[in-house]
Amino acid sequence: RRDRSYRWNYRNGPTFTGSFPRITDASQKEFFGSKVNSRLGVAAGILLNSRWVECYSRLGFDILTYKTVRSSERPCYPLPNWVFVEPINDLEPGSDEILRKARRRSRDPAEVTSAVCFGMPSQPPEVWRKDVRSARGKLRRGQLLVVSVVGTPAEGGGEASLVEDF
């Protein structure tokens, strides 16, 4: 939920209340050397933990990217960290001022654009490692779990620190 914090969504989400579709067997496709039911997936960001992975796998997504993790815990940026935006005027190449917060949100998904900056929060490694194992156990045959990993430099550590962490 956009009106709740990352921590709240991590603990309580997802809040999906619909029914799950019946998933039929399909001929498998190749995806970077792995066989998957489809190439329909979820990018890094919204699958905060194994509950989120399980929900989206049951909704029919077959390539599921576990929320970005780090070698240490990192908090999320405070709200608002996800806003709907619209162009200020016609998009001009090279212009710095091109977007503003949307005055109203369109009901047509093709007209909706959002800007997100969560700050790539992460649970501590001992938490996410155990949860990634749990997430893998919730996948069906033909589904693939990708874990998004990012390096975190030590305070004032520079490039060498980032490389060492990664």
Regions found by a protein language model. Give the residues of each.
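Active-site entrance/lid segments in N-terminal catalytic domains of soluble metabolic enzymes
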Residues: 15-16, 45, 50-166
